[in-house]
Amino acid sequence: MIDVNEIEVVVCGEEHVKYIDEILKTMSDAAKVRGTGIAKRTHEYVEKVMREHKAVLALYHGRFAGFSYIESWSHRLFVTNSGLIVHPDFRGIGLASRIKRRVFALARQRYPLAKVFSLTTGAAVLNMNTKLGFKPVTFEALTSDKQFWKGCESCVNFDILQRNGGQKCLCTALLWDPAEHLDEQPVIEEKMDNQKKEIKREKVVLAYSGGLDTSFAVKYLTECGY
């Protein structure tokens, strides 16, 4: 039996693009076996989140073992933990939980003030999210960003979402609100293996104006690493 501790869970970079085809095939195969909806991701999109260091990859001596990624919505007010998948050869050893903790830590590190949410039909993912402090919510509590919901169009259950006016589907909505965890700091449970890699950021110019309190903006930008 494979020892889960021998599996690396790293933040993705350009060097991991070579694993994309296997990641997408594993996702597609899982959707067929489960018979439930999984939104399809394109090669271009997965490459984008990898190059932007918004994804985590599990590797066993160079072999693909698992994957997940984050994405921000509504001007960084929300961030998703999405696409969690474990290769069949590495299931049942606790790897999914390790990936989930790492991708949640990445979301908190990159977007410390954002609400983190997840949509899932899987009991295992629901259980992992609950242990991290996520709570079930209605779809109304999630982002209204049209680009996010457009991603659901590739799911086999999209017609159910449409029939319910975008307010109900087979997925359970789970939300982690930082306002309910003010005493908790963003903690990275495991050392980021490629933490030293430089993440390119846009330049931000903050102009002060008399009578306008911009202290909240300074705090936000500082926490985001600017």
Feature roles, as predicted:
Residues 1-43, 185:
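Short amphipathic alpha-helix that is part of the acyltransferase structural core
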